[in-house]
């Protein structure tokens, strides 16, 4: 499936991608410049373009955008050789909705950023642990565990370079890493697991091939499915693999070339939903030998280095990315024949942004660059924005101090603040290093400035599916909402682990009785933060618990 009408594939050294309107992007994976010609089929519109050599680091390909006048398919030639024909899907670049205006109110409206504090590494990979500490690693140096309470770091060495690996949390709370770094676009087959209770790494049986930039997603069974990436030889790995806790199973019926770090989610039907970065979205069935089925096309074109998040069970927001867009769109996988729909646009176009779920059910966007090149650091976006799922409207919040683009990360902490860190550990297309941001900032959202917070004085540590749990709180009558958020695991503009759901509850004189999910599809086994909120949407500190 897909709009390609020539033999071009995602492994081709020169590719064409459709964006929106009459806009295309040409990619060159050759280590040398290539002169190409292009033509809009069915018209006399044509031109020539020199594609820069692929950079040695960062993206592994050079990119140039072409905007044409006519609405036909774009054909790309090298000499007399036809390289690719890319159809023009004729979709709009912007939805017909307004953009927000900047509020100049105080912290109770726009929130507040901390000063940037030093970190020992560039935190390209960021994970919340069971005790509220944070595990991070980059391209260089040992993985570090940061203690927010003491603002201290402890290194924990591992036998693999975990840079550009994929990761997820297991049902027992292990931070599971798959793949890693040999060199740019060449991945390790290694499988490693960090036990936060003992602070130790364990090496597990390796995958069949290396993977650099894969995505790891937990299934309802607690098994992990690994999709995408490039192997030891720089060849795209087309066959997904499933880890059952002791061994690997190849999904030989699901061969497909996918972009780096596919935006994958566990869908309500138990399959894996691939939301992008490509325009066409699909389901991956993991039973037997596996298989792909088409769901439909997004409204905007390729959203490379955009952010995607499951903001409610089965409902996904995809925002930013591409060259470069402020648009956002959603899909509801709970309905028959799901289709993508426009929602409100951000105030600023962004790529390399991070999207973080908040206890209020909103989605916070931080960082990124509005430039049209791969990582235009001179065009960094500092204004945070928050999306309201009920209205589809974005609101501008306070601005941070540090430019955070490629390799920046963000996660929600139990106290309701958002850790924003990383950016760098890469070189640009001219061989110059991007600034390495070995520091972290903390964002306190507006809800932390709206008065006293509800408190959880006790709650079960390891409740079962479908249980009604007693959550003690001093003023149960003040509690208006209860929500559950899976603890985060972020890298490369995507948190593959976070998901949010509202919970039903009743009140007693001393507690709220909260009904937990019954479905392992809606809430895969593992660790979550439970929040209770008052009528002003002020959340408690999250209580980390294991759902099993």
Predicted regions and their residues:
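Kelch-like beta-propeller repeat domains
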Residues: 98-548
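Asparagine-centered strand-capping/turn motif at beta-strand->loop junctions
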Residues: 26-30
């Amino acid at each position: 499936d897909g709009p390609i009408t020539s033999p071009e594939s995602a492994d081709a050294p020169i590719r064409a991608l459709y964006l929106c309107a009459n806009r295309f992007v040409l990619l060159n994976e050759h280590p040398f410049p290539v002169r190409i010609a292009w033509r809009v089929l069915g018209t006399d519109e044509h031109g020539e373009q020199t594609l820069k050599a692929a950079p040695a680091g960062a993206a592994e390909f050079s990119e140039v955008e072409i905007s044409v006048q006519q609405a036909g398919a774009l054909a790309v030639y090298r000499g007399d050789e036809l390289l690719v024909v890319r159809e023009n899907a004729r979709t709009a670049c912007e939805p017909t909705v307004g953009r927000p205006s900047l509020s100049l109110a105080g912290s109770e409206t726009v929130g507040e950023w901390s000063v940037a504090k030093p970190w020992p590494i560039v935190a390209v990979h960021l994970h919340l642990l069971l005790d509220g500490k944070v595990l991070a690693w980059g391209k260089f140096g040992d993985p570090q565990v940061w203690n927010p309470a003491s603002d201290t770091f402890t290194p924990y060495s591992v036998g693999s370079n975990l840079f550009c690996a994929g990761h997820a949390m297991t049902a027992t709370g292990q931070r599971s890493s798959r793949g890693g770094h040999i060199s740019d676009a060449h991945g390790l087959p290694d499988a490693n697991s960090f036990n936060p209770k003992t602070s130790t790494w364990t090496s597990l049986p390796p995958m069949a091939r290396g993977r650099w930039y894969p995505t790891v997603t937990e299934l309802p069974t607690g098994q992990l499915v690994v999709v995408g990436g490039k192997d030891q030889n720089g060849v795209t790995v087309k066959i997904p693999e499933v880890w059952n806790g002791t061994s690997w199973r190849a999904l030989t019926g699901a061969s497909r070339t996918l972009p780096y770090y596919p935006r994958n989610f566990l869908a309500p039907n138990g399959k894996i939903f691939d939301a992008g970065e490509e325009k066409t979205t699909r389901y991956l069935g993991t039973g037997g030998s596996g298989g792909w089925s088409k769901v439909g096309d997004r409204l905007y074109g390729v959203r490379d280095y955009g952010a995607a998040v499951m903001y409610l069970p089965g409902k996904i927001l995809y925002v930013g990315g591409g060259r470069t867009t402020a648009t956002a769109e959603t899909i509801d996988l709970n309905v028959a024949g799901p289709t993508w729909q426009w929602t409100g646009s951000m105030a600023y176009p962004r790529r390399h942004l991070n999207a973080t779920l908040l206890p209020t059910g909103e989605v916070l966007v931080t960082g990124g660059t509005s430039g049209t090149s791969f990582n235009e650091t001179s065009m960094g976006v500092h204004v945070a924005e928050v999306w309201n799922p009920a209205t589809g409207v974005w609101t501008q919040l306070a601005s941070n101090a540090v430019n955070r683009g490629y390799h920046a990360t963000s996660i929600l902490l139990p106290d309701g603040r958002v850790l924003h860190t990383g950016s760098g550990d890469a070189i640009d297309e001219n061989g110059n290093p991007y600034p390495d941001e070995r520091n972290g900032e903390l964002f306190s959202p507006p809800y932390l400035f709206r008065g006293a917070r509800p408190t959880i004085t006790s709650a079960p540590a390891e409740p079962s599916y479908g249980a009604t749990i007693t959550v003690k709180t001093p003023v149960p009558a003040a509690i208006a909402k209860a929500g559950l958020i899976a603890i985060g695991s972020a890298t490369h503009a995507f948190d593959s682990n976070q998901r949010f759901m509202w919970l039903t509850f009743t009140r007693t004189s001393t507690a709220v009785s909260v009904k937990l999910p019954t479905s392992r599809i809606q809430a895969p086994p593992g660790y979550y933060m439970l929040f209770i909120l008052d009528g002003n949407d002020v959340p408690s500190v999250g209580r980390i618990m294991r759902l099993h």
